[in-house]
Structures are given as structure tokens and as C-alpha cells.
Swiss-Prot record:
Family annotation (InterPro entries): DUF3558 (IPR024520)
Protein name: Putative lipoprotein LprB
Subcellular localization, as worded in the UniProt entry: Cell membrane
Domain of life: Bacteria
The UniProt record lists the keyword Nucleotide-binding: no
Major localization class: membrane
Length: 185
């Protein structure tokens, strides 16, 4: 009798362990008749835009001069982005450059549309994208993000101030974007 109980316990344990794998293979209605399943051919290659140097080719000094914020520290610097913070701390103004390779700008724009006061089309030096403005009740328009599309890639400059007075964030974001476009190869 003990042997039968043990075998039954092992069989039930095996079925319980196997259930998630089998359930993952089941037809749960996701592939309904007539539905299309997107696929990408194995040999499809994305079309990349130009190469952007580190930090979009913009120096720490240029960011400091344009933003008029002293004591900026480049706290994150790698091949796809940079971030400048006042005194290196997370409180206060922040400025960043990001380069998204093979990433759809539409998804980023949609996120901006859900979280910013306004999002508009923009064209800088013949390149299309968006400009997003964020505001705070006590500061007014204190954040500006410019995203520009290059084939399957895009870049984004973000300029955010935390206390008055400050220069117009969108003027800075547009100028930084212009400089990055000029520095691209």
C-alpha cells in the first residue's frame, strides 16, 4: 500500500510540475482565425541613422554655459547617453542626452503625450521629431524634451529646471539638439 501511495504522489507531483509548461503551449484564444501574427524575416536589418559621439558631441562646458547652472557634474557618461546634475546630486536641475538605437520614437512620443503639458512636431536642421513641454505650478514651463528621428534611431535631449530664475528650457534643448546633429557622423 505504501508503494502505491508513493507512486501516486510522484505521478501527481510530476503532473503538477509539468502543468505550466503544457499550459504555455495551449491555444488560449490569442491566435484567433483571421488574426495576423507579426513576424520579422530572419535577414531583416534595421536602418540606423548617423553615429553620435559620446554625450551627443556636447561638452560639459557647453551644457553649463547654455543652462547657466554652475557646479554641474556629468554623473552618467556612456556610449548612448549622458546626464548632468547640479553638484552631482539628484535634487535640483538635471539635463540629459540619450541615443536610442533601433527604438521607435513613436513610443517615446506617446509617453510624452501622456505625461507632459504639450507635445508638438518639430523640425531641426531638416530632421523631424517632437518637442514636449512640462510645467510645475510654482515654476511654469520648467522642462523641455526634444526627440529627433534618424531612420530606426532617435536622440533625445531633456532639460529640466527646479527653481527660478532659469533660461527658457526649450531654447536650450533645441540648441543642444542642433549641436548634436552637427556633431553626428
Amino acid at each position: 500500500m505504501r508503494r502505491k501511495v508513493r507512486r501516486l504522489t510522484l505521478a501527481v507531483s510530476a503532473l503538477v510540475a509539468l502543468f505550466p509548461a503544457v499550459a504555455g503551449c495551449s491555444d488560449s484564444g490569442d491566435n484567433k482565425p483571421g488574426a495576423t501574427i507579426p513576424s520579422t524575416p530572419a535577414n531583416a536589418e534595421g536602418r540606423h541613422g548617423p553615429f553620435f559621439p559620446q554625450c551627443g558631441g556636447v561638452s560639459d562646458q557647453t551644457v553649463t554655459e547654455l543652462t547657466r547652472v554652475t557646479g554641474l557634474v556629468n554623473t552618467a557618461k556612456n556610449s548612448v547617453g549622458c546626464q548632468w546634475l547640479a553638484g552631482g546630486g539628484i535634487l535640483g536641475p538635471h539635463f540629459s542626452f540619450s541615443w536610442y538605437r533601433g527604438s521607435p520614437i513613436g513610443r517615446e512620443r506617446k509617453t510624452e503625450e501622456l505625461s507632459r503639458a504639450s507635445v508638438e512636431d518639430i523640425n531641426i536642421d531638416g530632421h523631424s521629431g517632437f518637442i514636449a513641454i512640462g510645467n510645475e505650478p510654482s515654476l511654469g514651463d520648467s522642462l523641455c524634451e526634444v526627440g529627433i528621428q534618424f531612420s530606426d534611431d532617435f536622440i533625445e535631449w531633456s532639460v529640466s529646471f527646479s527653481q527660478k530664475p532659469f533660461p527658457l528650457p526649450c531654447d536650450i534643448a533645441k540648441e543642444l539638439t542642433r549641436q548634436s546633429i552637427a556633431n553626428s557622423k
